[in-house]
Amino acid sequence: MADHLEEMPLFPLNTVLFPYAQVLLHVFEDRYREMIRHCMQYDQGFGIVLIRSGSEVGDTADPYLVGTAVRIVSVQTFDDGKMDVKVQGERRFRIRRMDDESKPYLVGQVEPVIEMEVEDTPRTDALVLKTREYVQDYIESYFSRFDMKIAKVKLPQDATALSFVVANFLQIENIQKQHLLETTDTLERITEMIPILEQHMQEAAMPQYTRLDRLQVEEFISPN
């Protein structure tokens, strides 16, 4: 098993990132700036993992064991050395071993998390269709409050990719997102998300609703 492990720099954060999703990281600690420079020099990505205990700043945090490997999309370095780093989630991994001594930042020996194959059945089609309709209605309802008409919500055709994209912008606790990330059954993930989407749709009808983050969904929408 050890022969199949991949060495990966790890970035523990108070957030859960899914495959296919993008996030902008504000990097200011020396150890993580060094990590980003290392990744750029050797054209490699790193892993984002949710913090189980500890904090983002200071001593090394204790992370959950399942995270998402990301590739660096762009880096902006400021005069004071701080960085804005845009990354794209690509695949999940599970940490088998961790090393917090050889580098200033945490390094993991990781293996892939394998998703179960999705069976092409009427139930699958129905769940995927319901998810698409709910997401379309949810986003359109939210943006209509700002007099913005959405021509189209562009979501992945693949059921697994769809489940990850939707899970990323759900407004739920990190521990719930971590559970969805660790789930290896696409239909189970979608089934668990549908009642959450239903609740989001009800909340979105309220005037004070502001929970949807436009930055998380803007790459999937086409304004009129």
Across the structure, where does each feature detected by a protein language model lie?
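N-terminal low-complexity, acidic/polar interaction/targeting segments
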Residues: M1-N224
